[in-house]
């Protein structure tokens, strides 16, 4: 990292030699005064979009250039890097000045881990001075807070579109279960309610074939286990990785992790929860689960019909709600996901032009158009209302897929408006640690479920098969190992 930092700083020093970097001194209008329609400045914007999303973005760029760009003297040029990982690698190569690397862009869409690396190398511009307090107050607070991760609390990331996690369910096939048990979708208020419902569903489906022991079905699955851990601990009042003076410390609370364990690992090894295909929406399409937690941006992939193992197919409707909290949640927090834009250090004119573009693109008219056509949420409070979503939505509400996407966007708006949009702060090794924690819980659950299934196949009852895995001692051993390995990753 030190070599990388030195290399980047040397390159920036040579690029910016002779350029006077002007401070906005807290005035949001200073930057725009640097622009001259007679001497337009060119800004380069790196994105990772593809397909229809890229087409919509390129049309927005064209619209900007033909309006605000002409008026203020800004020419925006966008380059798609194909995917977010390629963009991150290419961006780091560019600022390091590697042979064959592209020129450093003015703006780039990145995750916070990449922004952290760039900030450590002193390559990012603080966006805060370009905005008035009134302007910043228009955005969902949590979206901006994600971009304030360094010691100076500078605003280094600017949001354009976001997503969250939603709880969805096949309400058509849920109805017979509800009729027999009284457990309706509306009765699920917490994750603990869901865990209890999944146990009942397993027993209910198992009882339908009394001649076959322990063939009950899983009710639920979720895509991101890392999100489950991070948002779960935060809801339960635990900041797992507090950062003080640039140094991260480990704060993994045993009680919080036991709640996570009891509401994912325990139901999973019992067969109440399940995961079979790559994504849980695929499991729902084949009837292997009825409910799932997944990204709001993937609502277009939610099933509109179920095809069973015998190739029979039936249409379904989907229940959509913001993800369920824990019963003891002390913070009404929801996951926020999605890359944001960072401003690379450039000339004062380029920086001013880039911020003008960001402000324009985040205005509800432009932002709603891009967000709705991308399946993501807009970033202002004004745009995150059901009425605003309904007025801007361009999908076909007469189709099940169109209705699913609309319901997901509406539920997301409610989640972001009435909850805390949460994202962890980046630090050295944060990406690897996130991957490790998610795989540690998910992998252990899958491994032990396989052992339980094998034991049942050999003649054990389910209660006998899971007994050794459900003890406090077993959890404590796993948790101690988890903490030790996590500590090693941040040292």
List each model region and its residues.
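Conserved C-terminal helix/tail region of periplasmic/extracytoplasmic solute-binding proteins
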Residues: 401, 407-491
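Extracytoplasmic/periplasmic substrate-recognition and gating elements
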Residues: 308-384
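Extracytoplasmic "Venus flytrap"/periplasmic binding protein-like
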Residues: 69-142, 177, 290-291, 308-311
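Short, polar/charged alpha-helical segment
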Residues: 51-75, 116
């Amino acid at each position: 990292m030190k070599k990388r930092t030195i290399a980047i700083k040397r390159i920036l020093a040579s690029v910016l030699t002779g350029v006077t970097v002007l401070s906005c001194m807290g005035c949001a209008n200073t930057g725009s005064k640097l622009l001259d329609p007679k001497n337009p400045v060119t800004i380069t914007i790196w994105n990772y979009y593809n397909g229809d999303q890229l087409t919509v973005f390129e049309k927005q760029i064209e619209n900007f250039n033909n309006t605000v760009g002409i008026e203020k003297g800004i020419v925006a040029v966008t380059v798609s890097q194909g995917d977010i990982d390629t963009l991150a690698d290419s961006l780091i190569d560019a600022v390091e000045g590697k042979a064959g690397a592209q020129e450093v862009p003015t703006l780039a869409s990145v995750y916070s881990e990449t922004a952290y690396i760039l900030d450590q190398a002193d390559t990012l511009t603080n966006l805060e001075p370009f905005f008035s307090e009134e302007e910043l107050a228009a955005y969902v607070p949590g979206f901006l807070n994600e971009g304030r991760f360094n010691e100076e609390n500078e605003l280094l990331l600017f949001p354009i579109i976001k997503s969250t996690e939603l709880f969805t369910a096949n309400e058509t096939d849920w109805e017979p279960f509800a009729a027999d048990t009284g457990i309706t979708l509306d009765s699920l208020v917490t994750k603990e309610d869901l865990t209890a419902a999944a146990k009942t569903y397993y027993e209910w489906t198992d009882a339908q074939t009394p001649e076959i022991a322990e063939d009950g079905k899983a009710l639920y699955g979720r895509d991101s286990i890392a999100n489950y851990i991070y948002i779960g601990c935060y809801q339960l009042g635990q900041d797992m990785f507090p950062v003080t003076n640039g140094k991260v410390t480990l704060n993994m609370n045993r009680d919080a992790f036991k709640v996570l364990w009891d509401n994912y690992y325990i139901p999973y090894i019992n067969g109440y929860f399940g995961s079979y295909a790559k994504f849980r929406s695929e499991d729902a399409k084949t009837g292997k689960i009825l409910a799932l937690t997944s990204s709001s941006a993937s609502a277009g992939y939610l099933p509109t019909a179920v095809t069973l193992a015998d190739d029979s197919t039936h249409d379904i409707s989907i229940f959509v709600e913001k993800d369920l909290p824990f019963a003891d949640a002390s913070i009404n927090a929801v996951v926020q996901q999605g890359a944001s834009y960072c401003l690379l250090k450039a000339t004062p004119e380029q920086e001013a032009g880039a911020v003008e573009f960001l402000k324009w693109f985040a205005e509800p008219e432009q932002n709603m158009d891009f967000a709705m056509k991308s399946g993501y949420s807009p970033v202002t409070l004004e745009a995150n209302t059901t009425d605003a979503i309904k007025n801007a939505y361009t999908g076909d509400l007469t189709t099940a897929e169109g209705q699913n996407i609309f319901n997901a966007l509406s539920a997301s708006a409610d989640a972001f408006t009435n909850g805390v949009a949460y994202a962890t702060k980046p630090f050295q090794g944060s990406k690897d640690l996130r991957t490790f924690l998610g795989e540690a819980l998910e992998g252990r659950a899958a491994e032990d479920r396989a052992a339980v299934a094998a034991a049942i196949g050999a003649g054990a009852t389910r209660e006998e098969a899971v007994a050794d895995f459900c003890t406090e001692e077993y959890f404590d051993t796993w948790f101690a190992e988890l903490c030790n390995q996590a500590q090693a990753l941040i040292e």
